[in-house]
Swiss-Prot record:
Residues 546-549 are annotated as: G4. The gene is infB. One of the essential components for the initiation of protein synthesis. Protects formylmethionyl-tRNA from spontaneous hydrolysis and promotes its binding to the 30S ribosomal subunits. Also involved in the hydrolysis of GTP during the formation of the 70S ribosomal complex. InterPro entries: EF-G-like_DII, IF2_II, IF2_N, P-loop_NTPase, Small_GTP-bd, T_Tr_GTP-bd_dom, TF_IF2_bacterial-like, TIF_IF2. Residues 292-301 have a biased composition (Basic residues). The lineage of its organism: Bacteria, Pseudomonadati, Chlorobiota, Chlorobiia, Chlorobiales. This is Translation initiation factor IF-2.
């Protein structure tokens, strides 16, 4: 417990830092809320912390959004750094490959950089240069300027490239065709001389045309850079210088994103020209061709890496800053990208949350917890040891311990019942199968306010006659046809306080609540409770003010009390419909039904009427019939429940043997909102369980067995824990008295009401221990269990069989029979009061003053005393006071008048006395006489 308290305390300054507000503001708020704090270093509990967060909700929202933005920015910066690192590694690899590459090899790929940039241009001029590769050679000679000596040099150095691949003529032809348009557009009068020079050039290469293709291509490209006579020289020099000396600088500039879109286009154009021109000047004539080939390959690799690096970095920068995007399309793409990233992050966060959320049933073992958390059982046990709990690997842990362990390991716990842990797959409703269904109306209100009388008049039958004391003992479900052949299903709930669970269950399965309030009474606690149940379930309320025919009826008083309870009727400007009725005389009943049907039409109640879907419903009530077995009242919610359907309901299963309405008439099927009595249960289901039709008996049995196993584990753990706790408590505080009880009743709802009522009757010393509960008559097994447990048997509207009655008389057991629940609760309360230890009170009898002390041989000191007040009996308890301080407490050893022993001495008389076991009596001591009186206690 100390650990839990420590973890639930928070410092005010830490809370203020988390909210990013002034600690003094938080301190002032805590003081306004009544918190006992002295400074910003004071600690507050978890409840006060939640109140602080609620008061500073806007600040907390801003802080959470800021943290989220920072987290997203941090993630993007991390991705940018990772991409930059990869780009830097690629650059280093590129430099290493350029420095280690051999000189002859690059020529094989020299034409590729020139091929890619201009591949679209020849498409418009291709018909003019359609001849094959050998015929294209004269065309190449048309492009150069009249610098024929330079072409002679290139031709003479051609033998160095004899080992080149055969496909180079085709590439050279393409390059020549690409260069032709510019050459034709800027052709000068000296072009005829260049044509003659080209003819002489072709004649000097009779046998080595294939090996000459690559140099011829390179030679033509070298001259191609000088086509623009007006301003081509500067561009040529600049492009050559940049491609030769600033390859690394270009890479760095693009890497840093410094170049704009227009400058990138210009640089790209210059790079294309530079590549076409051979990319670099040769320092010596003999190394010109090989140098150009090497530079060409280097530039090819650099260009590919530039594109990848530039694309990655620009996309990252544009994702971080709006200035990086230009145009609506780029902005739209950026927004879509950010949206996808946000969705991915949210999905990842949800997956992480699901990973940290584990669903367990209560009383799981350390081994099961370890499997769910992905840990070892040793880790769980060690954590329990550190928390002060000594457990074994298969020991069942309670709910608090499981929550504490999960919090220590950073997991969220969600507890499920045995039914939720084995839930069947939810079937999807087809909109075409959804049709209007009859409303389910629950009648609620205080006991004796006329709920059953109202239903009695609507059904035009005497329901109350079958109820003991005129009080409804269980939920009744009835289907009624009102005017206009409209169907309404009514649920009649008990009104007295013992049936709180039943009213809550009725509110959960209903569509509309009729709240019956007696006009001659007032709004009672059960009326308020019914209102709260209805509001919690989100069910509309129609108020019925009953007994208006009585002279003492006061409608306005009831409406005032209802408004104070949060139910403001329409007559007073509220939203709740109200109708004044008399259930006995039938006044206002038809108007009440119209309002109920109107409310149902507004809500547009739909039900699945498909015959292909598996039916399901709610167990409203269960009982054990002598000739029929277990009979349950089921309110069908979807589909059609038919005879022969296998089903599972809670921990029980079965097969529908028969269906009957509330009047005992057999039927073959029941649709939505239809109450029906079902025969065929193997075990007694609990009220409120969901009945689900299964595909086969085997599926139903397997599911029911799984639920039964989990339930047995829970019950075993609960009983074991109670015994262990009671042993420790009895050792520490003394024996706690228990009244063991066995309950047998006619219906499951009555058992639940009795159990809830009996559990409320207890205090620190006595309590009711419910040994067993069941539906049906009292049997020999119940009697034997009561004899072994020293328990009493309570039969609620049931009797024992012959053998059980004979055995109970033989064992001298206390078997009691009741038909009204109040009598059970009253008798059990009296029995518990009799088990309570009586209260002890001290009653003063008188006081005696010691005036002289005598020494008597073989007796000791004897005091001569005078009775100041009261009457002192011989057997009274006494205490000796000296100067107001208690010296002795005990009993009188002797009391005498003169020499005679007396039973008592009245006020104003002298006497002699001696104390039992005490001899130090002195003059002036005062002896007080008193007795202990026992007083009966009440719960």
């Amino acid at each position: 417990m100390a650990i839990e308290e420590k973890q639930s305390r928070f410092r005010i300054s830490d809370i203020a830092r988390e909210l990013q507000v002034s600690p003094r503001e938080v301190l002032q708020f805590v003081k306004q809320e009544g918190g006992k704090v002295a400074s910003t270093s004071s600690m507050v509990g978890e409840e006060m912390r939640d109140m602080i967060f609620g008061n500073f909700s806007q600040e907390k929202k801003l802080v959470d959004e800021t943290r989220k933005i920072r987290a997203e920015k941090k993630k993007r910066l991390t991705r940018l750094e990772e991409q930059s690192r990869k780009a830097y590694e690629k650059e280093q690899q590129l430099k290493e490959s350029l420095s280690s590459a051999p000189s002859p090899a690059p020529a094989a790929h020299t034409p590729e950089p020139v091929k890619e940039p201009f591949v679209e241009i020849p498409a418009r001029h291709e018909p003019a240069v359609s001849p094959a590769a050998p015929a294209e050679q004269p065309v190449i000679a048309e492009t150069p300027q009249p610098e024929s000596p330079k072409e002679e040099v290139v031709a003479t150095k051609a033998p160095e490239a004899e080992a080149k691949p055969v496909e180079q003529p085709e590439k050279a032809a393409e390059t020549a065709v690409e260069a032709q348009p510019e050459a034709q557009s800027q052709q000068e009068p000296g072009a005829e001389e260049s044509a003659e020079a080209s003819q002489t050039l072709v004649q000097t290469l009779p046998d080595s045309m294939k090996t000459y293709e690559a140099p011829q291509k390179i030679g033509g490209l070298t001259v191609l850079g000088t086509i623009d006579v007006s301003s081509g020289s500067d561009r040529k020099k600049k492009s050559r210088k940049k491609s030769f000396k600033e390859n690394a600088a270009e890479l760095k500039d693009e890497f840093e994103g410094a170049t704009s879109g227009s400058s990138e286009g210009g640089e790209a154009g210059r790079k294309k020209v530079a590549k076409a021109a051979g990319e670099g000047e040769s320092t010596t004539g003999g190394e010109d061709a090989s140098g150009k080939k090497k530079k060409g390959k280097k530039k090819k690799k650099v260009e590919v890496d530039d594109k990848v690096i530039s694309k990655n970095i620009k996309s990252t920068i544009s994702g971080m800053d709006d200035s990086g995007s230009s145009g609506s399309r780029q902005k739209f793409r950026k927004m879509r990208r950010m949206e996808r990233e946000r969705e991915l992050e949210e999905a990842e966060a949800m997956r992480e949350a699901e990973k940290s959320l584990i669903k367990v049933t209560e009383y799981a073992s350390p081994h099961e917890l370890a499997e769910l958390m992905g840990l070892t059982a040793k880790d769980i046990i060690q954590k329990c040891f550190t928390l002060g709990k000594f457990v074994t690997i298969n020991q069942r842990l309670d709910k608090e311990t499981i929550e504490l362990i999960a919090m220590e390991f950073g997991f969220d716990i969600e507890f499920t019942t045995e039914v939720e842990a084995t839930t069947t797959e939810e079937q999807v409703d087809n909109p075409e199968d959804m049709k209007t269904r009859p409303p389910v109306v629950t009648i609620m209100g205080h006991v004796d306010h006329g709920k059953t009388s109202l239903l009695d008049y609507i059904r035009r039958s005497n329901v109350v006659a079958g109820e003991s004391g005129g009080i409804t003992q269980h939920i009744g479900a009835y289907e009624v046809t009102v005017e206009g052949d409209r169907q309404i299903t009514f649920l009649d709930t008990p009104g007295h306080e013992a049936f709180t669970a039943m009213r809550a269950r009725g509110a959960q399965v209903t569509d509309i609540v009729i709240l019956v309030v007696a006009a001659d009474d007032s709004v009672m606690p059960q009326t308020i409770e019914a209102i709260n149940h209805s509001k919690a379930a989100g069910v509309p309320i129609v108020v019925a003010l009953n007994k208006i025919d009585k002279p003492e009826a006061n409608v306005d008083k009831i409406k005032t009390q209802l408004s104070e309870a949060g139910v403001l009727v329409e007559d007073w400007g509220g939203e709740y419909q109200c109708q004044e009725i008399s259930a006995k005389k039938g006044i206002g009943i038809s108007e009440l039904m119209e309002k109920v049907l109107t409310e149902a039409e507004v809500r547009e109640l739909k039900g699945n009427y498909s015959r292909d879907i598996m039916a399901s419903g709610i167990i409203v009530e269960s009982e054990l019939d002598k000739g029929k077995g277990v009979v349950s009242t089921v309110l069908v919610q979807r589909g059609f429940l038919k005879v022969g359907d296998p089903f599972v309901a809670g921990n029980s299963m079965g097969k529908v043997r028969a269906l009957m309405d509330e009047r005992g008439k057999r039927t073959d099927e029941a649709g939505p909102s239809t109450p029906v009595r079902v025969l065929g249960f193997e075990d007694m289901p609990q009220s409120g369980d969901v009945l689900t039709v299964m595909e086969s008996d085997r599926d139903a049995r397997d599911l029911a067995q799984k639920r039964q196993i989990i339930k047995r584990e829970h019950e075993f753990r609960r009983s074991t824990r109670v015994k262990l706790d009671s042993i420790a408590r009895q050792i520490k505080e003394g024996l706690k008295k228990e009244l063991s009880v066995i309950i047998k009743a006619d219906t499951d709802g009555s058992i639940q009401a009795l159990a809830d009522g009996l559990m409320k009757i207890h205090n620190e010393e006595v309590k009711v221990q419910l040994i067993h509960q069941g539906v049906g008559q009292i049997t020999e097994t119940d009697v034997l269990l009561a004899a072994a447990s020293d328990a009493i048997i309570i039969g609620f509207r049931v009797r024992p069989n012959v053998n059980a009655k004979r055995l109970a008389e033989k064992e001298d057991l206390d078997v009691r029979f009741y038909s009204v629940i109040y009598h059970v609760l009253e008798d059990v309360e009296k029995a518990l009061e009799g088990m309570l230890s009586p209260e002890l009170h001290e009653e003063s009898l008188g006081s005696i003053e010691i005036r002289q002390v005598f020494r008597v041989p073989k007796v000791g000191n004897v005091g001569g005393a005078y009775v100041l007040d009261g009457k002192v009996p011989r057997d009274a308890n006494v205490r000796l006071l000296r100067d107001g301080v208690q010296i002795y407490e005990g009993q009188l050893d002797s009391l005498k008048r003169f020499k005679d022993d007396v039973k008592e001495v009245d006020s104003g008389y002298e006497c002699g006395l001696s104390l039992k076991g005490y001899d130090d009596i002195k003059v002036g001591d005062v002896v007080e006489a008193y007795k202990i009186v026992e007083k009966k206690r009440k719960l």
